[in-house]
C-alpha cells in the first residue's frame, strides 16, 4: 500500500471495499462537472448510483460547502468517516459509512433520491468513460487523456 495516501484517501479505500462487498464498482475523485469532485462514485448491478464523501475530521466536514451539489448526481448520498468522527454533526437525511483503510460498513442507509433517466444515463456514461480512460492510462502512460484533475470531466 502506498505510504503517501491522505486520511481522506484511506477512508475512500475502505469505503470502496465496503461498496464492492455490496455489489458496486467504484471510481474515486470523479468530476461530474467543473467545480465538483466526488470522493467516491459507485455504480450498482441495477444501475443505481451512490456518491460517498470522505471526511477525516470535524474541520474537514465544516469547511465543505459543496456537498449538496453532489446530490444531483446520486441516487443515494453517504459520508464515510472513521470510528472517532462525531456522527451527530452529519445531516440525518444522509447515509453513513464507518470506514478505515481496511474496509467499512454501512452504519446508516441513505434515503433514495432517484435520478431522472436522462441524468442517470449521462452520469453512467461519464462514470464508464472515466473508468475506461483511467484503465487505458495505466496500460499506456504516454496516452494523452481528456483534461480534468481526475482524468476526465463530464457534465450531465
Predicted regions: what they are:
Residues 13, 56-100:
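Catalytic cores of nucleic-acid endonucleases
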Residues 22-24, 48, 75:
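Short coil/turn segments at beta-strand junctions that form active-site/ligand-binding loops
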Residues 1, 51-52:
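A short, structure-level motif marking secondary-structure boundaries and short turns
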Residues 19-20, 44-45, 71-73:
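Flexible, charged surface loops at secondary-structure boundaries
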Amino acid at each position: 500500500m502506498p505510504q503517501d495516501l491522505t486520511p481522506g484517501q484511506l477512508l475512500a479505500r475502505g469505503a470502496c471495499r465496503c461498496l464492492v462487498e455490496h455489489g458496486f464498482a467504484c471510481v474515486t475523485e470523479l468530476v461530474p462537472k467543473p467545480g465538483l469532485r466526488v470522493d467516491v462514485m459507485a455504480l450498482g448491478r441495477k444501475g443505481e448510483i451512490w456518491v460517498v464523501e470522505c471526511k477525516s475530521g470535524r474541520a474537514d466536514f465544516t469547511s465543505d460547502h459543496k456537498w449538496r451539489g453532489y446530490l444531483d448526481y446520486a441516487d443515494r448520498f453517504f459520508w464515510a468517516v472513521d470510528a472517532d468522527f462525531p456522527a451527530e454533526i452529519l445531516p440525518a437525511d444522509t447515509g453513513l459509512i464507518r470506514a478505515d483503510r481496511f474496509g467499512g460498513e454501512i452504519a446508516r442507509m441513505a434515503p433514495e433520491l432517484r435520478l431522472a433517466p436522462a441524468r442517470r444515463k449521462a452520469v453512467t456514461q461519464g462514470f464508464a468513460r472515466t473508468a475506461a480512460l483511467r484503465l487505458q492510462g495505466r496500460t499506456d502512460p504516454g496516452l494523452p487523456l481528456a483534461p480534468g484533475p481526475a482524468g476526465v470531466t463530464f457534465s450531465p
